[in-house]
């Protein structure tokens, strides 16, 4: 079975981001949230404190490439076979996820 991790980059997120990430967090083996915000807000603190997420604080806006690299490096260190990269506004329907397993 493939080991799949997700990497979601945050930038000044609003509360809707939590429900967006929750559409796919249980579909992956590891769910990394990389915070690229200038200041932490209540959403940042939620991901930092919730044990079902790996929270990486970039300590300010380092750019999306640096944030994605940080998340993917973490997933690589955990020997994930695939990385699902998402932005904070994205949802992931279960049917789309299941299609991954049909790839030859």
Question: What does each of the following model-derived ranges do?
Answer:
Residues 58-75:
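Glycine-rich, basic loop-to-helix element that forms the pyrophosphate-binding segment
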Residues 7-27:
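Short, well-formed alpha-helical segments that are part of the catalytic scaffolds
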Residues 8-10, 35, 86:
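Short beta-strand/turn micro-motifs composed of small residues
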Residues 80-89:
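Short beta-strand-to-loop acidic/aromatic patch adjacent to the donor-nucleotide binding site
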Residues 90-103:
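Acidic donor-binding/catalytic loop of UDP-sugar-dependent glycosyltransferases
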Residues 35-38, 62, 89:
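Conserved short acidic donor-positioning loop in nucleotide-sugar-dependent glycosyltransferases
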């Amino acid at each position: 079975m493939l080991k799949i991790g997700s990497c979601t980059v945050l930038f000044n997120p609003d509360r809707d981001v939590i429900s967006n990430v929750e559409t796919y967090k249980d579909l992956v083996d590891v769910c990394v949230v990389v915070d690229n915000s200038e200041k932490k807000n209540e959403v940042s603190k939620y991901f930092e404190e919730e044990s079902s997420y790996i929270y990486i604080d970039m300590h300010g806006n380092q750019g999306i490439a640096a944030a994605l690299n940080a998340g993917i490096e973490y997933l690589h260190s955990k020997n994930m076979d695939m990385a699902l990269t998402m932005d904070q506004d994205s949802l992931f329907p279960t049917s789309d996820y299941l299609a991954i397993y049909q790839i030859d």
